[in-house]
Swiss-Prot record:
GO terms for cellular component: cytoplasm. This is Glutamate-1-semialdehyde 2,1-aminomutase. It comes from the Bacteria. Signal peptide: none annotated. Belongs to the class-III pyridoxal-phosphate-dependent aminotransferase family. HemL subfamily. It is found in: Cytoplasm. InterPro entries: 4pyrrol_synth_GluAld_NH2Trfase, Aminotrans_3, Aminotrans_3_PPA_site, PyrdxlP-dep_Trfase, PyrdxlP-dep_Trfase_major, PyrdxlP-dep_Trfase_small.
Length: 434
């Protein structure tokens, strides 16, 4: 393996110990602290292609990809070159730039639901704005979200949220007023009957339904056949909006996102990660008649100092250009399918219960008998055994998400040799923890 079993992380340990006196929990996003897998987190020094190097010089095959953006591989040379050229013109204008038009046209041409788009600085910002827009357009205040679906850390969405909230075992967050979440209704993912019941109880007050079309923040959970179609029918019946949070799936499971992959067009879509090519970015878009509610075209206010900045736009444009090349998604699909199937085969060979799946460049597995169709069923995952697996994989040079409740990501940079090495590490690690 690339990294020796006697993993030396002395510099990482020292830096994280110091960081805990400087930043809450020593990190700037909770999942990075390794709380659910134990041990000290790995401090990275640099990344390139499919690999990450820590400050102690250990190299890892990376399957978090900066939590999704690095679909073309870390530090892709063409993206870096484009950014270097853009840097000579300045980092932020605080005024319109031509690059915004270019990326907006690319997004509109790619994503079926998007007729107009607004760029922001994060997925959280995009989801905050889209919720305000849902309410402004419909004149209704309630919204339905799904248990385990994560839409950023805004107050109104921290109800039965996934991602770091699930990792830390928090039902919600202190500091969120009950009045803020009173209009947030929740249903189990993949449960159309629960959604129908909520609409029956609140026929004239639900502005819409927001969901991850493929859940990635409660582990990897795909939609049941007919689930997305059912949501489209129900929302139309009640005059409510359907919103796909494609921050994770956008441009990852197909060039047009989950909506293009499954053939279901929502009214609004949120995006992020891939469209910024590794720089901070978010976006929301949809039908023109709805988007024209957004200021200054309409009365719904939303703004941002760094929104549409030239560096994020440049990285996004180049990334989408790379993704549009022939054969891109076929390669991603084949690479990820081989990895996901190999993981399950390795677990079963070790006598461990396992279930999992993949779609294009996104995958996941649970250490339990499946199938897992929602967040409640995901809790059957053996988190204690996963923690041991995570450490064993680190010692064998593979960096997995440090949580049972996060999807994994592949990239165009992952080679057949990388997958071979990863599966060998899984085989050894599963035998070790069985």
């Amino acid at each position: 393996m690339v990294t020796a079993a006697a993993l030396n992380t002395s510099r990482s340990d020292a830096l994280f110990t110091a960081a805990q006196q400087l930043m809450p929990g020593g990190v700037n996003s909770p999942v990075r602290a390794f709380r659910s897998v134990g041990g000290q987190p790995i401090v990275f020094d640099r990344v390139e292609g499919a690999y990450a190097w820590d400050v102690d010089g250990n190299r890892y095959i990376d399957y978090i990809g900066s939590w999704g953006p690095a679909i073309c591989g870390h530090a892709n040379p063409e993206v870096i070159e484009a950014l270097q050229q853009a840097l000579t013109k300045g980092t932020s204008f605080g005024a319109p730039c031509a690059l915004e038009n270019t990326l907006a046209e690319m997004v509109i041409n790619a994503v079926p639901s998007v007729e107009m788009v607004r760029f922001v600085n994060s997925g959280t910002e995009a989801c905050m704005a889209v919720l305000r827009l849902m309410r402004a357009y419909t004149g209704r205040e309630k919204v339905i979200k799904f248990e385990g679906c994560y839409h950023g850390h805004a107050d109104m969405f921290l109800v039965k949220a996934g991602s770091g909230v699930a990792t830390l075992g928090l039902p919600d967050s202190p500091g969120v007023p009950s009045s803020t979440t009173a209009n947030t209704l929740t249903a189990p993912y993949n449960d159309l009957e629960a959604v129908k019941a909520l609409f029956a109880e609140n026929p004239d007050s639900i502005s819409g339904v927001i969901l991850e079309p493929v859940v990635g923040n409660a582990g990897f959970i795909p939609p049941d056949f007919g689930f997305l179609e059912g949501l489209r029918e129900i929302t139309r019946e009640y005059g409510a909006l359907l919103v796909f949070d494609e921050v994770m799936t956008g441009f990852r499971i197909s060039y047009g996102g989950a909506q293009a992959r499954f053939g279901i067009t929502p009214d609004l879509t949120t995006m992020g990660k891939v469209i910024g090519g590794g720089l901070p970015v978010g976006a929301y878009g949809g039908r023109k008649d709805i988007m024209e509610m957004v200021a200054p075209a309409g009365p719904m206010y939303q703004a941002g100092t760094l929104s549409g900045n030239p560096l994020a736009m440049t990285a996004g444009i180049k990334t989408l250009e790379l993704l549009k090349r022939p054969g891109t998604y076929e390669k991603l699909e084949a690479t990820t399918k081989r990895l996901a199937e190999g993981i399950q085969e390795a677990a079963k060979a070790a006598g461990l219960p396992v279930c999992g799946n993949s779609i294009s460049a996104m995958f996941g597995f649970f250490l339990c008998d499946g199938p897992v169709r929602n967040f409640e069923e995901a809790k059957a995952n053996d988190s204690e055994r996963f923690a041991k697996l995570h450490r064993a994989m680190l010692e064998r040079g593979v960096y997995l998400a440090p949580s049972s409740f996060e999807a994994g990501f592949t990239s165009l940079a992952h080679s057949d040799a990388d997958i071979d090495a990863t599966l060998e590490a899984f085989r050894e690690s599963f035998q070790l923890i069985a």
